[in-house]
Each structure stands twice: as structure tokens, then as C-alpha cells.
């Protein structure tokens, strides 16, 4: 998941008094927060899921050890949260500045066959693609709204590249066919893309899960 800097400017209340900015959330709390969001959406804990679906004992054991594929892993926030609960994670990231990544490669080079060979079929896929060209602050530099389709057509080379990447990720998801998948992005332009239509979407805010920031996020 992309990291966002907290606004360094203190908050000015309506009475004119200056209050300090909210404290930064620790990495451990961030990991727990992301797992809580993920769990809420797909009705975790897994033991409850298993009971509700009336599966056999072998499947129960399999679901107690989920295989998670984390794309655009970065600091591995969601991966660490799953690992802390005993699940198996395979992370993919192109930037070698990030540590403890299973596969360093351009996502465009990654194939379903490669994932299956090296990791197996994932139960869950979590993808956090670049949000730059969809963010409210920068979208006018990268995209223009198509009046006929409503799509935010790319006008910059980087936006065109990002669209190819995102559609490649959707292809990977279709080929790997996980039980659950998540495409995480700050609430912005991605939800308006034609290739995102028909995909279930939840908008969550960090303050719903105990953080001081709102930070609306589409998953």
C-alpha cells in the first residue's frame, strides 16, 4: 500500500486556537488496521467463514492457512498483517529499496503461470497499484473525462502506462481466480474507469478503525 505523508500543518480550530497535528500511526497499528479492513469486507475470522459454508475438515484446515498474493507490495503492510496471523504471503514489487520481497520484477513481466509455479494458487490477491494519475491533486495533468463513456482517458504517457499495468493486474486476477481479491486505491479517479465497472467496491475510512485520519480509500 502506498505511503502518504501526514500534513505537517497544525489544525486551526474554529475558535482560532492551534491544536497539534494527530500523531503518526505506528507500523504495527497500520498493519492491524489494514487487516481489520480486509477482515470486515470478507467476513473474517476464517473460522466463522468455514462454519457458515459447511465445508469438510480438509478445507477447514486449508482456510486456516490462507495463501495471499500481494502485488505492488512496497512496505508489505497487508502482507505483514496476514503473516502475523499465520497465513502464507508471496509479495511482488519492482523497487529493490523495499526489503523482504519474494519477487522483484516489473509487474508487466509477471505471469499467472509464474505465480502458480513459485507459490501456487492464491486464495486472496491484494493489489495496491500506483494512485498518482488518479489522485484529485494530480489527475488534471494525466487524464481528461470522456463525455461519452465517462472514462478518465489518459493524456500523459505515465497514465497510459498505468492503465496497461492495471489491466494486466485484472488479467492476472482472472487467470489465477482467487476466492477473494482486493484492488486498493485512495478514493479518486480509478473508480470511474470503464474496466473497473462491475467490480464490487467498498469505501472505507481509517477513522472507522481507530485512526485519527479519515483517508477515504476504495477497496
In which residue ranges do the predicted regions lie?
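Conserved active-site and SAM-binding loop architecture
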Residues: 2-3, 7, 12-17, 26-219
